[in-house]
Curated annotation (Swiss-Prot):
NCBIfam families reported in the protein's UniProt record: rplS_bact
Record lineage: Bacteria, Bacillati, Actinomycetota, Actinomycetes, Streptosporangiales
Pfam families, sorted: Ribosomal_L19 (PF01245)
Function: This protein is located at the 30S-50S ribosomal subunit interface and may play a role in the structure and function of the aminoacyl-tRNA binding site.
Annotated organism of origin: Thermobifida fusca (strain YX)
The family this protein is said to belong to: Belongs to the bacterial ribosomal protein bL19 family.
GO CC, alphabetical: cytosolic large ribosomal subunit
PANTHER family found in the cross-reference section: LARGE RIBOSOMAL SUBUNIT PROTEIN BL19M (PTHR15680:SF9), RIBOSOMAL PROTEIN L19 (PTHR15680)
GO MF annotation: an example: structural constituent of ribosome
Full protein name: Large ribosomal subunit protein bL19
Swiss-Prot/TrEMBL keywords: Ribonucleoprotein, Ribosomal protein
InterPro entries for the chain: Ribosomal_bL19, Ribosomal_bL19_CS, Ribosomal_bL19_sf, Translation_prot_SH3-like_sf
Example GO BP: translation
């Protein structure tokens, strides 16, 4: 039974997910359904966390919208995500960047990775 579940999960994994880490800035193109219309909404922000593995893997993206911090958690292999673009690669020394929640303005900048 265990291997049957693994085979089903392996079939659901996406192959078009780029390599990204916490500190990277992403454009996440999300399919949004409003009534009977669907459209693509871009959520641009910094990855502050990536956790889980396999089909259960998720990542959290943080952005500042109208002076309010907004965090959104996405499943990596979700069919709702059209595509993920890596805008820039950040250089950080932590796996979880929760400390960014307390920083404002220039203090919240992340150095570019070469």
């Amino acid at each position: 039974m265990h291997t049957a579940i693994q085979e089903l999960e392996k079939a659901q994994l996406r192959s078009d997910v780029p390599d990204f880490r916490p500190g990277d800035t992403l454009n996440v193109h999300v399919r949004v359904t409003e009534g009977n219309r669907t459209r693509i909404q871009v959520f641009k922000g910094v990855v502050i966390r990536r956790q889980g593995s396999g089909i259960r893997e998720t990542f959290t993206v943080r952005k500042i919208s109208y002076a309010v911090g907004v965090e959104r958690t996405f499943p990596v292999h979700s069919p709702v995500i059209e595509k993920i673009e890596v805008v820039s690669r950040g250089r950080v020394r932590r796996a979880k960047l929760y400390y960014l929640r307390n920083l404002r303005g220039k203090a919240a900048r992340i150095r570019e990775r070469r």
